[in-house]
Amino acid sequence: MSSDNIKVIVRCRPLNARETRENALNIIRMDEASAQVIVDPPEQEKSATQAKKVPRTFTFDAVYDQTSCNYGIFQASFKPLIDAVLEGFNSTIFAYGQTGAGKTWTMGGNKEEPGAIPNSFKHLFDAINSSSSNQNFLVIGSYLELYNEEIRDLIKNNTKLPLKEDKTRGIYVDGLSMHRVTTAAELSALMDKGFANRHVAATQMNDTSSRSHSIFMVRIECSEVIENKEVIRVGKLNLVDLAGSERQSKTGATGETLVEGAKINLSLSALGLVISKLVEGATHIPYRDSKLTRLLQDSLGGNSKTLMCANISPASTNYDETMSTLRYADRAKQIKNKPRINEDPKDAQIRQLRDHIARLEAQLAEAQANGAKPMDVLRIGKSLMKAINGDELNLDGTFQGTAGAKLSEARDGDSEGESTEEEIVFVEDEASRKAADELEAKRRALAEAKQKRESELEQKEALNKEAIVTLTDLKSQLSAIKNSVFVVKQLEIKDKVLGKAQQKLTTRQEKHNALQQALQNKQTEHQTKTAEILSAVEKLERLKADISKTEAEINEVNQEIDDITEQHALSIEEERRELKEVDKRSALLDAIIQTFIPQCEVAKAEALAEYDEETMKWAISPEKVDREHQMLLKRVRHMQILYPSGSTKPVFFGKGKDTRALVNFSQLSGNILELEPELPERMTVGEEMDGYQSYGMNEDEMHDTQLQMFYSQIDTYE
């Protein structure tokens, strides 16, 4: 299995209106001939750190400047990967860069200038339509997004989908809808429908900032007969639009947008770690750190041809982000993948679809031959049409519904209702259509036979013309031979003269060669002496050149260290800022809890909470809540109510060995922040009893009333 490095290209967009208002400078130079990107550090960067900063140069597989167009990039860089998919390879194209760098424009574009995805669709179906007649294709499309580490189907529904893995299918999204398409327009409509459901939001960097990573997946199956054997190749095309990395200080994100940005940066950090580990050749690659890296596992170091398009901004205000993106891309180009052609996979759906259609056709023929009821024939016919259109295709390659099973059920049970005239007409139309098809086939056969006969007649006429031309040529050649006899005699005389002249020339050439050799020896001796004289000077010049080159390399390495140090410091500052926001929110929640929630209730809530490692969220366990309710109800049912001597307020005791006072509910409203409480609408038990004394109740009546109120509270809680 041959290895293939990830291809990396870089595209730079023009300065936008915001950067122009900020008087940002263009610090990017592109050398498309040598595929190099030169980054000129802005003046403020030089003065703020050190004056020795020099332009940085990065080399990639291809670079495209601000004047490049989507179609030109597709033809030069993306098209070979689409061709590889048709050959049975897996291919991945993904765009990476900071927010607002032009990733979505490169991948999607618009109607006037379509991007990589629509251009891929058009090229894909152009190749399919021009393929040989013995090739059959099945094209299936799916569209998903990764939003806040949750996978969602952008076409069928917006519910969370689980990510699973098995030995035969590898890593897959369970429940992701698959849609069979037959034209590029249908595939583009599928993409437009999903794109409308994608999460976007406005930030200070981008008015339509993508808040999720999206992957459009196209599966192409090709069935072909080679040497009387059917061969099925399955190619998979992943078109990935990554959300941009962003800094909160530049985007101004708050609230939900800030949380989205944190999740985006977290997944991109995991992607960067995977790339670093792959470049280092580590034994353990942390693909499981993020769902993004799990989805791209085959594309990074696996069975796939991968192209990364790094999008950068030319503005001097984005120098740090641009350098980070270029370093990211420079590491990625060192990753080696191991792509292979996927021949006869176990999950090939084109064979299963063909077998399913054949079974339905056999069932339809059997039903018509056995005189089945029109309703049953209609049911099988509808199932056959759905199978032909691919409406019953599932993710696992099975098919919804079984017409044969339904037919058997119809035979065993009583039919409900009579067949309608419309159903009978359907069967008759089906028979008429088959007869028309047979007639059309015979007509085509006669036309082909006629065409073949005409072709044979044309070939015979061509042979006759060729024979006439050949005879004429032979006559001309015979005349030429007769004329050449005299010429041959004259040539023999000339050959003798030329032989003598050639001998004289050879003698002169030998003398010339001897003189030339002597001259060459003298020149060699002279060059040797000259080399001895100049060797010291040349050696000195070479040493000076080596010293200059080494100094330049040292300066470049020092600058790289300084840039990385600055980048690290900025990252730490950004993390501190985010941590400060988190601490502020945590302190606010602590203050609310300490002020308004009793400590005992906080402890109970903490005991009931559980942390979900997969979703990274706290949740209240229903089982623990149920156990807590049952335990509290059990304790309440076993309570005893006593009245201390001289007091009308009850005290509650547990039965049995535990005779300690449990809770004095009459005093729960006291001592809250040592503030004067507002008068509540509902009084506590003790206060109500004090009020009842003013109505002239005796102690027994007060006791009965108190018990009724207490148990009504228990029933309400239960």
UniProtKB/Swiss-Prot annotation:
Assigned keywords, A-Z: ATP-binding, Cell projection, Cilium, Cilium biogenesis/degradation, Coiled coil, Cytoplasm, Cytoskeleton, Flagellum, Magnesium, Metal-binding, Microtubule, Motor protein, Nucleotide-binding, Transport
Binding site for ADP: 100, 102-105
Superkingdom in the source lineage: Eukaryota
Positions of ATP binding: 97-104
Pfam families, A to Z: Kinesin
Subcellular location: Cell projection, Cilium, Flagellum; Cytoplasm, Cytoskeleton, Flagellum axoneme; Cytoplasm, Cytoskeleton, Flagellum basal body
GO biological process per UniProt: cilium assembly; intraciliary anterograde transport; intraciliary transport; intraciliary transport involved in cilium assembly; microtubule-based movement
Residues noted as binding Mg(2+) in the record, renumbered to the chain: 104
Effect of a null allele: Knockdown of expression by CRISPR interference (CRISPRi) system results in significantly shorter membrane-bound portions of the caudal flagella.
Gene Ontology MF terms: ADP binding; ATP binding; ATP hydrolysis activity; magnesium ion binding; microtubule binding; microtubule motor activity; plus-end-directed microtubule motor activity
One term under GO cellular component: ciliary pocket collar
Disulphide linkage map: none
Coiled coil regions, renumbered to chain: 432-477
Domain Kinesin motor: 5-335
Known role: Involved in anterograde intraflagellar transport (IFT). Involved in flagellar assembly.
PANTHER family according to UniProt: CENTROMERE PROTEIN E, KINESIN-LIKE PROTEIN
Quaternary structure, from the entry: Monomer.
Similarity comment text for this entry: Belongs to the TRAFAC class myosin-kinesin ATPase superfamily. Kinesin family. Kinesin II subfamily.
Protein name (Swiss-Prot/TrEMBL): Kinesin-2a
Provenance organism: Giardia intestinalis (strain ATCC 50803 / WB clone C6) (Giardia lamblia)
Source species taxonomy: Eukaryota, Metamonada, Diplomonadida, Hexamitidae, Giardiinae
Gene: kin-2a
